[in-house]
Curated annotation (Swiss-Prot):
UniProt protein name: Tumor necrosis factor receptor superfamily member 13B
Subunit field text: Binds TRAF2, TRAF5 and TRAF6. Binds the NH2-terminal domain of CAMLG with its C-terminus.
Glycosylation sites: N128
Residue intervals on the Cytoplasmic side: 187-293
Transmembrane intervals: 166-186
UniProt repeat feature TNFR-Cys, residue ranges: 33-67, 70-104
Residue spans, topological domain Extracellular: 1-165
Any single GO CC term annotated in Swiss-Prot or TrEMBL for this entry: plasma membrane
Feature: compositional bias, Polar residues: 126-135
Cited PANTHER family: TUMOR NECROSIS FACTOR RECEPTOR SUPERFAMILY MEMBER 13B
Gene Ontology MF term list: signaling receptor activity
């Protein structure tokens, strides 16, 4: 009796346990104890990896894990466990989680691969940065007196050509003025001084003596009169020289009218006065070998 009672009690206990905890609940409790990437196998009574059944078309136990595994294999996507969906990283770059950090950093470096939204956002940031930098440079230029030009002022090609051509003309004008000044300086330095009196041409002694004789023979206020010349006029005017002592008859001095007689030894002897007449006589020494010899 006791055994039957025990068996009944045991049977009741098992039945009660089965009623209280059906088979599905037991498996659920077992699956709860398994990690996320594993599932509970009721036949083997242990946790198995979900990777072995992800390739099958119909999987119920590891559906979430298999979906996350396939999402990780795709580049630029990650699996959101809250939404239980695969999300592209390109649509959330800038506010991306750590799973999309590598993808978003590479995409930001190459703006060609960015989506249009990110391109617009980035272009707007670049424009804002350029405006801020332009304003900063404008403040610097306004603060400095040396460069009063407006910020962002750009000259066209025609204006640049006009500026350079004007500078070239100014440089040419300065160079021409310098060359003209140098030429005038060299010319002035090479010319003699105009203040110095010009030297008179020297006359031959014969011509000068003849001029003096003509001036002496003719009065100053009257016109010049004809003059005769002779070789041996007034022999008493001749000065004795060594040649005349040896060979007489070869006189050498010059006698000009009423002027003194000049010899080779530069001795002056008075000539006799000639009575006033219409003709003035000028004595010229005879040359050796001439008709007077």
């Amino acid at each position: 009796m006791s055994g039957l009672g025990r068996s009944r009690r045991g049977g009741r206990s098992r039945v009660d346990q089965e009623e209280r905890f059906p088979q599905g609940l037991w498996t659920g409790v077992a699956m709860r104890s398994c990690p996320e990437e594993q599932y509970w196998d009721p036949l083997l009574g242990t946790c198995m990896s979900c990777k072995t059944i992800c390739n099958h078309q119909s999987q119920r136990t590891c559906a979430a894990f298999c979906r996350s595994l396939s999402c990780r294999k795709e580049q630029g996507k990650f699996y959101d466990h809250l939404l239980r969906d695969c999300i592209s990283c390109a649509s959330i770059c800038g506010q991306h989680p750590k799973q999309c950090a590598y993808f978003c950093e590479n995409k930001l470096r190459s703006p060609v691969n960015l989506p249009p939204e990110l391109r617009r956002q980035r272009s707007g940031e670049v424009e804002n940065n350029s405006d801020n930098s332009g304003r900063y440079q404008g403040l610097e230029h306004r603060g400095s007196e040396a460069s009063p030009a407006l910020p962002g002022l750009k000259l066209s090609a025609d204006q640049v050509a006009l500026v350079y051509s004007t500078l070239g003309l100014c440089l040419c004008a300065v160079l021409c003025c310098f060359l003209v000044a140098v030429a005038c300086f060299l010319k002035k330095r090479g010319d003699p001084c105009s203040c110095q009196p010009r030297s008179r041409p020297r006359q031959s002694p014969a011509k000068s003596s003849q001029d003096h004789a003509m001036e002496a023979g003719s009065p100053v206020s009257t016109s010049p009169e004809p003059v005769e010349t002779c070789s041996f006029c007034f022999p008493e005017c001749r000065a004795p020289t060594q040649e005349s002592a040896v060979t007489p008859g070869t006189p050498d001095p010059t006698c000009a009218g009423r002027w003194g007689c000049h010899t080779r030894t530069t001795v002056l002897q008075p000539c006799p006065h000639i009575p006033d007449s219409g003709l003035g006589i000028v004595c010229v020494p005879a040359q050796e070998g001439g008709p007077g010899a």
